[in-house]
């Protein structure tokens, strides 16, 4: 559980939101801070992309899927593992989806 702006936000044992509808950009900043990340424009681009992906496909992207989809939309410079790991050092798919208020990707350990 997470306390944000005086409200209890239900999370799983790893800190992923149980209800994606509770997410807001302000909450994303708080989740990112808990992960040791200060969100830059580049982080927001990935976080918003992951949310759009989830809304379209009803699943959080695993790393391979995330890299490929990012490359298709933003080009090879941003659609590669090195770029994404620089932004999300504990795992791009795991951290980006957590900050985006989405369920943990199925293939993430």
Curated annotation (Swiss-Prot):
Cellular location(s): Cytoplasm
tRNA processing found in the keyword field: yes
An example molecular function term from Gene Ontology annotations: transferase activity
InterPro entries with a match to the protein in the record: DsrC-like_C, DsrC-like_dom_sf, DsrC-like_N, DsrC/TusE
Keyword annotations of the record: Cytoplasm, Transferase, tRNA processing
Biological processes annotated in GO: tRNA wobble position uridine thiolation
GO cellular component term of the entry, any: cytoplasm
Pfam families: DsrC
EC number(s) given by UniProt: 2.8.1.-
Catalytic residues, chain numbering: 108 (cysteine persulfide intermediate)
Top-tier EC class: transferase
Family: Belongs to the DsrC/TusE family.
Subunit structure: Interacts with the TusBCD complex. Interacts with MnmA.
Function recorded in the entry: Part of a sulfur-relay system required for 2-thiolation of 5-methylaminomethyl-2-thiouridine (mnm(5)s(2)U) at tRNA wobble positions. Could accept sulfur from TusD.
Record's protein name: Sulfurtransferase TusE
Organism (species): Salmonella choleraesuis (strain SC-B67)
Gene name in the database record: tusE
């Amino acid at each position: 559980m997470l306390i944000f702006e005086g409200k209890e936000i239900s999370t799983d044992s790893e800190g992923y939101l149980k209800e994606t509808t509770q997410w807001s950009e302000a909450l994303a900043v708080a989740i990112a801070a808990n992960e040791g990340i200060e969100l830059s424009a580049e982080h927001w681009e990935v976080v918003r992309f992951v949310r759009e992906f989830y809304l379209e496909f009803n699943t959080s992207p695993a790393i391979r899927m995330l890299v490929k989809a990012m490359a298709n939309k933003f080009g090879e410079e941003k659609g590669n593992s090195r770029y994404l790991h620089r932004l999300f050092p504990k795992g791009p798919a795991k951290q980006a989806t957590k900050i985006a208020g989405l369920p943990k990707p199925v293939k993430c350990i």
